[in-house]
């Protein structure tokens, strides 16, 4: 019992996790959540006002309830489908979208992850939100698209297919966990590039460097599968991985191997920590060394998309 009392944060994590799971599986209405938070806050204030041992259980119960409801509220808030301007709430097939990453070349198409910025409903331009996957018919115009570009599209979104086999990797669930619920295929005359690019310049630079590094890997005669694994390990670029490779690694429990992780960051930190040994001899060298290490680690995080 004493050990339990010495772990207050752990005790609060349990109702928080239960709240997240409750919202995921049952989707509690927002109004009920707010009512619950208000009741819990009143209970908490009452127990603080009484401030006697007799009412301590109310303080504990209300604290757990607040964390439980807070988890439900946060999970509800970050669900893109609960956004009042989500594209799925509008009846339209004309959209303005923004590329969230660089395009990815597939065997028969060009893939892009985009964010819906505007819907066009009855001639009116309405601000919108939500992410989708677009597949473009291959041509030179598509290959010029980069992160941050805005394009106009004319299409009807399609739901992502469920796996056909019971043991197959659930690509639909994987995308939904990342806030993506629809996809679309665009032939050449169903989209048009605008002159607008609202990408963040730091990310633009990081993606350009990653493109250059990927070109170096391509010039080393790797097979397509080897290139996809190498780009995931070294550059954090997992878009080149096909479903078969993802399924192979996930079924063997080794999917984490293909992700840039804290281990990579730790190795880079140690390498530069010892490379910058000469800074230790300077008067303010330790401060300069620390600043450089932070810049390098943050730069690597941007470079790999962490």
Description of each model-found segment:
Residues 2, 55-59, 64-256:
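Membrane-interface helix/helix-cap signal primarily in integral membrane proteins
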């Amino acid at each position: 019992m004493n050990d339990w009392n010495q772990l207050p944060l752990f005790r609060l994590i349990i109702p928080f996790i239960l709240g997240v799971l409750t919202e995921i599986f049952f989707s509690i209405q927002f109004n009920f959540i707010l009512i619950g938070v208000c009741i819990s806050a009143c209970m908490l204030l009452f127990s603080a006002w009484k401030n006697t041992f007799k009412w301590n259980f109310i303080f504990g119960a209300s604290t757990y309830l607040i964390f439980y409801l807070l988890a439900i509220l946060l999970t509800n808030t970050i669900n893109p489908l609960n956004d009042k301007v989500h594209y799925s709430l509008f009846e339209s097939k004309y959209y303005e979208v923004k590329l969230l990453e660089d395009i990815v070349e597939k065997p028969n198409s060009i893939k892009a992850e985009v964010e819906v910025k505007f819907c066009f409903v009855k001639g009116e331009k309405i601000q919108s939100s939500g992410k989708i996957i677009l597949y473009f018919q291959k041509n030179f115009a598509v290959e010029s698209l980069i992160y941050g570009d805005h394009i106009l599209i004319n299409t009807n979104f399609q739901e992502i297919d469920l796996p056909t086999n019971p043991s197959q990797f659930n690509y639909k669930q994987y995308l939904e966990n990342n806030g993506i619920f629809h996809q679309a295929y665009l032939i050449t005359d169903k989209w048009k590039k605008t002159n607008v690019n609202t990408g963040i310049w730091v990310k633009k630079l990081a993606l350009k460097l990653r493109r250059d590094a990927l070109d170096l890997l391509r010039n080393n005669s790797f097979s397509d599968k080897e290139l996809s694994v190498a780009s995931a390990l070294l550059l954090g670029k997992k878009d080149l991985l096909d479903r078969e490779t993802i399924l192979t690694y996930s079924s063997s429990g080794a999917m984490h191997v293909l992700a840039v992780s804290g281990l990579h960051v730790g190795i880079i930190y140690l390498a530069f920590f010892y490379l910058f040994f000469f800074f230790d001899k300077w008067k303010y060298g330790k401060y300069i060394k620390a600043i450089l290490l932070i810049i390098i680690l943050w730069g690597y995080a941007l470079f790999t998309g962490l």
